[in-house]
């Protein structure tokens, strides 16, 4: 029975290949035919039903220039599919679909901020796109969004439609396959993840930034030579993906030759960057902290904190990181100042409460208050093994 299931899964994958190839050639009839033939294999895997039904809806939309009314609901994946279908059909409701998605409290849908910005630029709503990225912080945004923010701040609007367009059905299906690849990656099924990632790249090779997931998959599999090969796709033209490349190369050096050599490598690359972005400063501070070079980490954290506005959301986290570095050096006065200020900004941060409480207990200082903080931290995150 296991062999039968394996064969059925392979048959389904083979049909997905045929469907993808038909879509690439703009042959919707053939894609639909192969999809119908795959029907008997879609129940063999929990993702296959989602893939089958989503592709059925997309092909119907591309072929008939309207949205299928009789369709199954897969929760947030259906919301994502609906947003792209409306965008493809140039419906005004695409805007509300993207907004519903990125404001959804049931998960992290920040990737779709990129597609909302792309939609705004495609519809000549440049000022609205500027407003969206104005709300993003470089330090705590995803790789794709930091690059997007940089493009808009440098007026490089054409770069968005160069890599993705809602008018192109292949770009849309490519993004859906990328989503499936991400789902498999989150299950540590890197072989399946790379299968869908390769299909995604086949349909839209312009979206070279998606190869960062390929690099991550190979890295998690400790296939470092393949990681290095993929990373060569990222050059200085897209500075945040180039920085991602440097960081990943550094991690490989650390794993193979130790922290000292890794820190030397990233430091030499960092020094060559003119006017490095705060995100890059933040990353190198974290590398120094992880390598126990706390003085250097403090120097960089201080530089970032000094540049932030008083109401910056990320200040609390930076004070926590700098405070932890002071604590490791035995400078308890400054450590306590930073950690208490971090809690003043965000009183319910369980990790900060936990860290400060244990620091005080180890010093036999403010014991009653420390125990109260521990109890509060546990109440906030009682399912967290680190609390």
Sequence positions of predicted segments:
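Alpha-helical solenoid repeat scaffolds
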Residues: 1-261, 275-294, 314-328, 350, ...
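Amphipathic alpha-helices of TPR/Sel1-like and other helical repeat/solenoid scaffolds
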Residues: 3, 192-200, 266, 339, ...
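Catalytic core segments in nucleotide and nucleic-acid processing enzymes
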Residues: 296, 300, 343
């Amino acid at each position: 029975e296991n062999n039968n299931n394996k064969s059925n899964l392979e048959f389904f994958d083979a049909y997905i290949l045929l469907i993808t190839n038909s879509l690439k050639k703009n042959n919707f009839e053939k894609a639909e035919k192969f999809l119908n033939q795959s029907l008997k294999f879609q129940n063999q895997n929990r993702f296959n039903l989602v893939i089958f039904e989503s592709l059925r809806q997309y092909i119907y939309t591309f072929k008939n220039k309207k949205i299928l009314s009789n369709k199954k609901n897969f929760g947030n994946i259906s919301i994502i599919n609906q947003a792209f279908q409306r965008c493809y059909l140039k419906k005004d409701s695409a805007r509300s679909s993207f907004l519903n998605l990125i404001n959804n409290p049931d998960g992290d849908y920040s990737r779709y901020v990129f597609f909302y910005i792309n939609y705004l630029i495609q519809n000549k709503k440049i000022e609205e796109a500027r407003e969206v990225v104005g709300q993003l912080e470089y330090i705590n945004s995803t790789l794709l969004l930091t690059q997007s923010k940089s493009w808009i701040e440098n007026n490089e609007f054409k770069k968005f439609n160069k890599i993705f367009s809602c008018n192109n059905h292949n770009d849309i299906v490519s993004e859906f396959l990328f989503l499936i690849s991400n789902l498999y990656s989150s299950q540590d099924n890197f072989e399946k993840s790379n299968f869908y990632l390769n299909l995604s790249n086949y349909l839209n090779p312009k979206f070279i930034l998606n190869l960062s997931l390929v690099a991550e998959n190979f890295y998690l599999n400790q296939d470092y030579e393949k990681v290095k090969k993929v990373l060569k796709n990222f050059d200085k033209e897209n500075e945040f993906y180039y920085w991602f490349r440097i960081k990943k190369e550094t991690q490989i050096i650390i794993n193979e030759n130790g922290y000292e050599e890794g820190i030397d490598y990233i430091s030499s690359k960092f020094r060559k960057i003119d006017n490095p972005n705060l995100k890059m400063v933040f990353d190198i501070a974290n590398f120094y902290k992880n390598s126990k070079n706390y003085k250097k980490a403090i120097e960089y954290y201080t530089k970032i904190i000094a540049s932030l506005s008083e109401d910056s959301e990320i200040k609390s986290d930076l004070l926590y990181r700098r405070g932890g570095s002071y604590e490791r050096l035995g400078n308890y006065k400054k450590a306590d100042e930073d950690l208490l200020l971090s809690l003043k900004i965000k009183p319910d941060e369980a990790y900060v409460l936990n860290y400060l409480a244990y620091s005080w207990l180890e010093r036999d200082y403010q014991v009653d208050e420390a125990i109260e903080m521990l109890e509060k931290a546990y109440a906030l995150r009682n399912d967290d093994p680190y609390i």
